[in-house]
Amino acid sequence: MGEQPIFSTRAHVFQIDPNTKKNWVPTSKHAVTVSYFYDSTRNVYRIISLDGSKAIINSTITPNMTFTKTSQKFGQWADSRANTVYGLGFSSEHHLSKFAEKFQEFKEAARLAKEKSQEKMELTSTPSQESAGGDLQSPLTPESINGTDDERTPDVTQNSEPRAEPTQNALPFPHSAGDRTQALSHASSAISKHWEAELATLKGNNAKLTAALLESTANVKQWKQQLAAYQEEAERLHKRVTELECVSSQANAVHSHKTELNQTVQELEETLKVKEEEIERLKQEIDNARELQEQRDSLTQKLQEVEIRNKDLEGQLSDLEQRLEKSQNEQEAFRSNLKTLLEILDGKIFELTELRDNLAKLLECS
């Protein structure tokens, strides 16, 4: 459930005003992740963007789509199926160009796939069927976009690397104020970088999780509808069997028909059992997704606690810097006083030396 994104970037998302068809209406309050996905169920490629649990872009790429750069950091494309025009505002021209290149790459692959499908239709269809089958589109494949499966493997598995847990070992207490300041600064920076990386990974997993939840919910609804239809068909067949059993003049025909109907009912019951197992599996996946959501909330709480602790460490760092500056000023004053005292002492020693010499001369004269 839930394919990995082939390419992702961040941008502000807009849609054209459905009333005026001129003004842009923002659909996200801040920059969100916009990703290309391969839908293996329908064999198509999509552009999907989520704002929390809300899908603000769900556009299927077709050969007739065109991505237009309207400025250095803004581009747009029209989706006739969604009956709207999407706009993306990027942080730099480089990100816009990269997104446009990927769009053109998928569009070209869709066009080539369509041409191959039409060639096959011309070889296997009659002339009348050829004129009627010109608009058919062939589903896209991963190989037509990225060449081989090996080329796309790094993009799929890049988020599966294990994350390193933060170390909890206590730091040795420094002997001087400068060492304590440096130790606190390093500890604060390391903790902040770790949780920033953790939050970025968490956001990426949250986007994948939301997409999987949306797909699971849609599949559950579809299975429930099919289950209800199978149940109605089974009830109708049971009623038909009962009616046929009541007709005694057609006993042989009824028996044969009954056997066929019972076989059909048995097949339907087996199908229902398979669908029920599928629904249970989907429910289990939804429960797992909820557990991941709870883990995300727990990590978010830990991140907030670390941010509070980081602020406390910054306050302690500022206080230590002030104390260090005060200590340096006091040492400078002490050195100045000591220098003055040494100069006075040198003068006194010089005077005593002269006095000693004078006394010695007096003793020699006497």
Swiss-Prot record:
InterPro entries according to UniProt: Homer, Homer_EVH1, PH-like_dom_sf, WH1/EVH1_dom
Stretches assigned to the WH1 domain: 2-110
Entry keywords, A to Z: Acetylation, Cell projection, Coiled coil, Cytoplasm, Phosphoprotein, Synapse
N-acetylglycine: residues carrying this PTM: G2
Locations listed in the record: Cytoplasm; Postsynaptic density; Synapse; Cell projection, Dendritic spine
Biased composition (Polar residues): 138-147, 155-170
Coiled-coil region list: 193-364
Chain intervals for the UniProt region annotation (Required for tetramerization): 302-366
UniProt-listed SUPFAM superfamilies: PH domain-like (SSF50729), Tropomyosin (SSF57997)
Chain residue ranges for the region called Disordered: 114-189
MF annotations from Gene Ontology: G protein-coupled glutamate receptor binding; transmembrane transporter binding
Cited CDD domains: EVH1_Homer_Vesl
GO cellular component, one term: postsynaptic density
Domain topic, free-text comment: The WH1 domain interacts with the PPXXF motif in GRM1, GRM5, RYR1, RYR2, ITPR1, SHANK 1 and SHANK3. The coiled-Coil domain forms an antiparallel tetrameric arrangement.
Assigned protein family: Belongs to the Homer family.
Complex formation: Tetramer; this tetrameric structure is critical for forming the high-order complex with SHANK1, which in turn is necessary for the structural and functional integrity of dendritic spines. Isoform 1, isoform 2 and isoform 3 encode a coiled-coil structure that mediates homo- and heteromultimerization. Interacts with GRM1, GRM5, ITPR1, DNM3, RYR1, RYR2 and SHANK3. Interacts with IFT57 and OPHN1. Interacts with SHANK1; forms high-order polymerized complex with a mesh-like network structure, at least composed of SHANK1, HOMER1 and DLGAP1; the complex formation is SHANK1 multimerization dependent.
This protein's name: Homer protein homolog 1
